[in-house]
Amino acid sequence: MLKEKYDEAAIRDLICDYRDFHPFPKGDERQLVEGLPDCLQKRWIEAGKRYLDFSWPPLPAVRFMDFKRNGNRSEFEKLHFKRRNVLATLVLAEYMEGKGRFLDQIINGIWAICEETFWGVPAHNYVSGYPDAPLPDVNEPIIDLFAGETAGLLCWTYYLLKSQLDKVTPLICRRIETEVKRRILDPYMERDDFWWMGLLSIRPVNNWNPWCNSNCLTAFLIIEKDRDRRVKAVRKALESLDAFMAVYHDDGGCDEGTSYWGRAGASLFDCLELLFWASGGRINFYNEPLVQQIGRYIYRAHIHDEYFINFADGGARVAIAASLVYRYGQRIGDQRLVDMGISAYHLQAEKRKQYAGEIVPASLLRQL
């Protein structure tokens, strides 16, 4: 469906150079950044201030091994996600304030994460060639959900703050380039056997497909300088996303449950937005009936406020990504979806006040 619409030659003509990828103002475009609402700037700056003296937690090998030894994944994950959430918070704080006081801690966070053996989590080590191994193999970089999320975090950090980081030393952003290339860009181009890609008949794909693809696309659009590789990566992503859409019925229903829509249909939207931005709107799939139906599913499963029909792994209450739902509705011209995003934003107002100054989730694309 998607791959058929744009062949490699068309993608080459439509996709922008990496230097021209500019979906958001960068951190050195102060006039544009400072035009954001004061309440938004204050919220992120206050959140970042909490971590000016943060001690970055180590990730002990034995905590990774816990999963194979006793089934505990949470102890490692607490440390893993803490690092990423703190870095995301500091990045947004520096982006908003622009005075440099968060940069040292941002550098500490970047360096700590770049030093990790594996950017994923123990429960996903089965994706490797040694699925029963208690530790990750440094010689086989694999792409799971959170290796992808980590790459996305570092790439958006690079995009937003490269100018400021380069003034300290260009080695910081070069390190991001090196690690993202080794862990994400090269495996994505060289391998077809990650089950989530759907390129081989290994197992049916699910939300992993658009979620991983969205972060891999982010990395190629921001970091990859070779035009041929960028074009081939986009083409491969379209083929992979076709495998995801092939498991959907015409009504766009998400068989994984409503709470998974946020990383299934919504991650498909992330992918389509990245391509839309990278082509100046010329790579556009928003008129595709199935793309529209996948978006509409979330309001068709809605009961009231934050309550949704719960089935499969879906909970009864879901805090949807309000801005994403709003933008999805705008793209497909569906006012009901737009209104749902607006309603969710107002419903979540009290929660935003309650957690003002708290840590920001690591997915920077969703925050931007």
Give residue ranges: language-model regions.
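Non-membrane alpha-helical segments in proteins
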Residues: K82-M96, N108-A112, G148-Y159
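Asp/Glu-centered strand-loop micro-motifs enriched in Gly/Pro and often flanked by an aromatic residue
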Residues: V33-K82, L92-M96
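Extreme N-terminal leader/anchor segments
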Residues: M1-W44, L92-Y95
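Active-site lining segments of carbohydrate-active enzymes
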Residues: A133-G257, D270, Q348, V360-L368
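Long, well-ordered core segments of solenoidal/helical folds
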Residues: G48-L59, I106-H124, I172-M197, K232-G252, ...
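Carbohydrate-active enzyme catalytic cores, enriched for enzymes
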Residues: A266, D270-L368
